[in-house]
């Protein structure tokens, strides 16, 4: 599937434009169905976007927010994506949104993934908006090169839902939506910043194995065109 590149002068301009575009998609979903779904990613890159989006005029009570992936850590942990979203997105008007976490207080990551799969099924499919990030190793979501369940995660026949992932570069065990859960979003975004990430993207767009740079799965096989938002 083709990708569309959206280039901005700086990260601030990107954050505002992405918030406008995502807000418009959510508003359209609410107008059409009465509800909207949004899955976002962690890391430092989306903080400004989250803050901009939280200020958009929407009927946030009709929006359900979840995460593309999460570490198997409780929300009070500094490395929790849940905490990042709570601190930066679920505030101002967006405090009215419903949030469905991937982390669950279970004995194991596998048990948490099973619970999260059940709870996130309430969002319906496809998701209205998915905002992905990308690491310097070419991972997206928790699709890490060398990941324990990477082949399963990227297999389009794997059912929608949340599975576990462990990898050398991942730190804690991860919980991640499968490729099948994300690839047909109504608006599928890759948000990256900096020259380094642009170089990684160029590598990913070249020939090579998806398992080496899993973002290639989204670039090549997503049902929705990948909307790439980049700023230096």
UniProtKB/Swiss-Prot annotation:
Task: Quickly give the catalysed reaction.
Answer: 6-phospho-D-glucono-1,5-lactone + H2O = 6-phospho-D-gluconate + H(+)
**Phosphoprotein is among the record's keywords:** no
- Does the keyword Hydrolase feature in the UniProt annotation? yes
Name the InterPro entries on file. Answer: 6-phosphogluconolactonase_DevB, Glc/Gal-6P_isomerase, NagB/RpiA_transferase-like, PGLS
Q: Which domain of life is it from?
A: Bacteria
Keywords tagged on the record: Hydrolase
Q: In which pathway does it act?
A: Carbohydrate degradation; pentose phosphate pathway; D-ribulose 5-phosphate from D-glucose 6-phosphate (oxidative stage): step 2/3
The biological processes this protein is annotated with in GO are:
carbohydrate metabolic process; pentose-phosphate shunt
Record-listed E.C. numbers: 3.1.1.31
One Pfam family matching this protein:
Glucosamine_iso
One annotated GO molecular function is: 6-phosphogluconolactonase activity
**Family as reported in the entry's similarity comment:** Belongs to the glucosamine/galactosamine-6-phosphate isomerase family. 6-phosphogluconolactonase subfamily.
Q: Which NCBIfam families match?
A: pgl
Role of this protein: Hydrolysis of 6-phosphogluconolactone to 6-phosphogluconate.
Name of the protein described by the UniProt record: 6-phosphogluconolactonase
Source species of the chain: Rhizobium meliloti (strain 1021) (Ensifer meliloti)
Q: Which gene encodes it?
A: pgl
């Amino acid at each position: 599937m083709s990708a569309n590149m959206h280039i901005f002068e700086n990260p601030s301009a990107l954050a505002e434009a992405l918030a406008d575009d995502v807000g418009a998609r959510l508003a359209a979903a609410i107008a059409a169905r009465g509800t909207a779904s949004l899955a976002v990613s962690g890391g430092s890159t989306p903080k400004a976007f989250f803050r901009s989006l939280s200020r958009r005029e929407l009927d946030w009570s009709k929006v359900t927010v979840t995460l593309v992936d999460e570490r198997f850590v409780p929300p009070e942990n500094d490395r929790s994506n849940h905490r990042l979203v709570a601190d930066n997105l679920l505030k101002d008007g967006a405090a009215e949104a419903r949030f469905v976490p991937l982390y669950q207080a279970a004995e194991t990551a596998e048990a948490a993934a099973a619970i999260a799969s059940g709870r996130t099924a309430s969002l319906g499919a496809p998701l209205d908006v998915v905002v992905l990030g990308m690491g310097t190793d070419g991972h997206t979501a928790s699709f890490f090169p060398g990941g324990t369940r990477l082949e399963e995660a990227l297999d389009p026949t794997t059912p929608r839902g949340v599975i576990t992932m462990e990898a050398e570069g991942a730190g804690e065990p991860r919980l991640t939506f499968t490729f099948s859960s994300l690839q047909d979003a109504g608006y599928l975004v890759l948000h990256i910043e900096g020259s380094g990430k642009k170089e990684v993207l160029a590598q990913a767009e070249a020939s090579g194995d998806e398992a080496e740079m899993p973002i290639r799965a989204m670039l090549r096989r997503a049902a929705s065109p990948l909307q790439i938002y980049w700023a230096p």
